[in-house]
Amino acid sequence: MTTRGLMLVLLLVAPPALAAELPHEVAEFVARRDRCDHFRGEDAENPARIREIQRGLRANCEGTDAALARLKQRFAGHAAARAVLDRYDDAVE
């Protein structure tokens, strides 16, 4: 994802002042987990689209539960990061 794309995602997730305060690791997680949540919310009957959704889930969701726990621990004292991270479910895999 480009820097511009990442900033657009952050602006949708957090107010501009908050987005500017997020550590890069958290911003990357937000972008990935939002893609994961997008694919989790999709339903399809077309076999080709089902395969595409499954690929999207594997690519974007696998490992995010552990990553979220790790980031919450690492940034426990960082109010802006925790505010964003606390919005995500702890278990989606």
Give the ranges of each region predicted by the language model.
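Single-residue recognition of alpha-helix capping/boundary positions
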Residues: G5, E25-V26, R49
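Short S/T/G/P-rich N-terminal loop/turn motif that feeds into the first structured element of a domain
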Residues: L10-L11
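N-terminal signal peptide c-region/cleavage motif recognized by signal peptidases
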Residues: A14-P16
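Cleaved targeting-peptide boundary
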Residues: A19-A27
